[in-house]
């Protein structure tokens, strides 16, 4: 890919202007931020700060593919967070949820569940929640 340029960036300080990025994906990163496992500083709100930064740079009508562990909300010491479905939805009020899919705990039995429900997500211990959000046209953030 001759036009590909790879850069290093800090998810807490992305090098993009406000509302300038049309498409973002953040897959299995947020749950680790602020827990110190990968050399980052301990910050109990690190994940929320990173989410705020993703929201800052995503353009109107922009798409965000956001993947995190889903189940009963908790922090696994020095490893990762597990989020409830409702937690993730509450973090993105200025976005429309276009699709939610799930790789459940029993993925060998159930496989990939496209258009999974909140109820199925709530039954997981450590499912893989795949959210497709789209920023609404106008908001007050």
Locate predicted features:
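A conserved beta-strand element that flanks and buttresses the S-adenosyl-L-methionine
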Residues: 25, 30, 34
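Acceptor-substrate binding/catalytic loop of class I
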Residues: 45, 66, 71-91
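Class I S-adenosyl-L-methionine
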Residues: 85-138
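A short acidic, Gly/Pro-enriched loop at the edge of an enzyme's catalytic core
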Residues: 12-24
